[in-house]
Amino acid sequence: MSDLAKLESEILSAVAAAPDEAALEAVRVGALGKKGSISALLSTLGKMSPEERKTEGAAINAAKDKVTAALTARREVLKNAALDARLASETIDVTLPTRETPAEQGRIHPISQVMDELTAIFADMGFSIAEGPDIETDDYNFTKLNFPEGHPAREMHDTFFFNRKEDGSRPLLRTHTSPVQVRTMLSQQPPIRVICPGRTYRCDSDQTHTPMFHQVEGLVIDKGSHLGHLKWILSEFCKAFFEVDNVNMRFRPSFFPFTEPSMEVDIQCRRGKNDIRFGEGDDWLEILGCGMVHPNVLKNCGIDPDVYQGFAWGMGIDRIAMLKYGISDLRQMFEGDVRWLNHYGFKPLDVPTLAGGLSS
């Protein structure tokens, strides 16, 4: 038994001293492998008398169990140590300067950048950001916004509908961010001043349209709100966004079910071969739609139109990003081409501010 105790002690010491998993495996094979020292002792049990086999077998198996447990514990310690070493080697100091190459540094997508620019501009004017779900109800997307039954926008070729529920309702992918305005008016009392950026969906795909696109809408509800306020907000936005000192705007009569009167807005521009200059030239370009919130919409949202008035506007984020940064094909924004993103994308630390410059 003294030889067995000595062997057990030597093996346990070797297990404890194993510097890595390879060395530990060598100890295991030397002790418990086919030709290992403990395995060799077990093979001698067949030559012993029953009384000796019972005594020696119990002692050898006890030693085997101790070695097995020690191997398992040491293997776990080595695994944890290896993981700690790997984590330490991969630690990144976030206070260090970022790498310079685009492939290593990454790029902010132009749409994300423009959404940040919009947020900075309207936040400076005192607007809050409101958000809502992409999957909407027919009531919020159409009915409460004064879309009568049978309106073309309700048809399948414009809207992505889901299967009807048991109660007969039919969810849909929102076709504009106007449902967020509805939810805002239902959840808070005037005065209201919000912008609603987000994804929208329509069955359309060509050079200037995609089935999923981004839109931002603005809403102001207050006593005495009028078109003069709307014109000032849009004018200040265009000057800040396109980074020009002055911009001439043209309001044309139009029709939207949720506003009355409704208008489309053009801004003065000069078209070059590969770019468009705003605030100069003798051409015009439509950029958004707007109008005074229809009294029916206010009523549907629990607001008295005899006390409060409001105005709203909406524009495509993808479209104004294309105009500002000279992107010719909307579909390229969603193709995931790293070369395209390296060219049109922004550095991660290019956070747009009015003081520091939106796109500098």
UniProtKB/Swiss-Prot annotation:
**Main subcellular location:** cytoplasm
Residues binding Mg(2+), per UniProt:
260
Q: Where are the transmembrane segments?
A: none
**Gene Ontology biological-process entries:** phenylalanyl-tRNA aminoacylation
Where found, per UniProt? Cytoplasm
What Gene3D superfamilies does its record include?
Bira Bifunctional Protein, Domain 2 (3.30.930.10)
Keyword hit for Isomerase: no
Q: Cite the entry's keywords alphabetically.
A: Aminoacyl-tRNA synthetase, ATP-binding, Cytoplasm, Ligase, Magnesium, Metal-binding, Nucleotide-binding, Protein biosynthesis
Keyword Aminoacyl-tRNA synthetase set for record:
yes
State its cofactor.
Mg(2+)
One GO molecular function term of this record is: phenylalanine-tRNA ligase activity
- The superkingdom of the source organism is Bacteria
E.C. number(s) listed in UniProt: 6.1.1.20
Query: Which CDD domains does this UniProt record tie to the protein?
Result: PheRS_alpha_core (cd00496)
Q: Which InterPro entries does its entry note?
A: aa-tRNA-synth_II (IPR006195), aa-tRNA-synth_II/BPL/LPL (IPR045864), Phe-tRNA-synth_IIc_asu (IPR004529), Phe-tRNA_ligase_II_N (IPR004188), Phe_tRNA_ligase_alpha1_bac (IPR022911), Phenylalanyl-tRNA_Synthase (IPR002319), tRNA-bd_arm (IPR010978)
Q: Which reaction does it catalyse?
A: tRNA(Phe) + L-phenylalanine + ATP = L-phenylalanyl-tRNA(Phe) + AMP + diphosphate + H(+)
Question: Tell me, what's a Pfam family for it?
Answer: tRNA-synt_2d
Q: State the free-text cofactor note.
A: Binds 2 magnesium ions per tetramer.
Q: Give the CC-aspect GO terms.
A: cytoplasm
Q: Which NCBIfam families match?
A: pheS
Q: Which family does it belong to?
A: Belongs to the class-II aminoacyl-tRNA synthetase family. Phe-tRNA synthetase alpha subunit type 1 subfamily.
- Give the multimer and partner information: Tetramer of two alpha and two beta subunits.
Q: What is this protein called?
A: Phenylalanine--tRNA ligase alpha subunit
